[in-house]
């Protein structure tokens, strides 16, 4: 699968790295908050259920996502693969922006410019 993704991105020579900080140590707590918030709940909805979880995890996951972004060369891109809602929490922690729940195969484009971040959608075709 990684070979296919690298070929599709035309980045066969770019190394694949693992950022362990993007893995939550409290996955079960995320599942509980998601279930309590209801089907299709956003990170914002889960925050109403477990404010400490979302605030602390967003900070941790956002910091890990910042490490990925900071390691990129100018014009570089990274593909971060993981589970919802922790990806959404990482985006919140990095950018301060709440995004809606992402389905399988969905993602966002985060652009860093002069120390600030913008979040855009990625078209799925």
Residues covered by each model-derived region:
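Acidic, low-complexity terminal tails and accessory targeting/binding regions
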Residues: 17-32, 74, 88-125
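Internal catalytic-core helix/loop-beta-alpha segment
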Residues: 38-72
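Short catalytic/ligand-binding loop motif for oxyanion handling, primarily in non-cytosolic enzymes
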Residues: 1-3, 87-90
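A structural signal for well-ordered alpha-helical segments within the folded catalytic domains
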Residues: 59, 63, 84-89
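Beta-strand elements within well-structured catalytic alpha/beta cores of enzymes
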Residues: 73-82, 86
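Phosphate-coordination/substrate-recognition cap region in phosphate-metabolizing enzymes
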Residues: 1-45
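Aromatic-acidic/polar surface patches that form glycan- and anion
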Residues: 54, 58, 79-80, 99
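Alpha-helix C-terminal capping segments
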Residues: 2-6, 71-72, 110
């Amino acid at each position: 699968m990684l070979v296919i993704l690298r070929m599709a991105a035309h980045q066969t020579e770019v190394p694949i790295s693992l950022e362990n900080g993007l893995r939550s140590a409290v996955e079960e707590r995320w599942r509980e908050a998601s279930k309590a918030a209801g089907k299709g709940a956003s990170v914002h909805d889960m925050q109403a259920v477990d404010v400490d979880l979302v605030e602390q995890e967003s900070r941790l996951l956002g910091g890990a996502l910042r490490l990925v972004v900071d390691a990129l060369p100018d014009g570089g891109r990274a593909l971060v693969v993981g589970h919802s809602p922790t990806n959404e929490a990482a985006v919140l922690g990095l950018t301060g922006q709440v995004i809606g729940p992402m389905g399988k195969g969905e993602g966002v484009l985060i652009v860093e410019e002069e120390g600030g971040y913008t979040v855009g959608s990625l078209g799925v075709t």
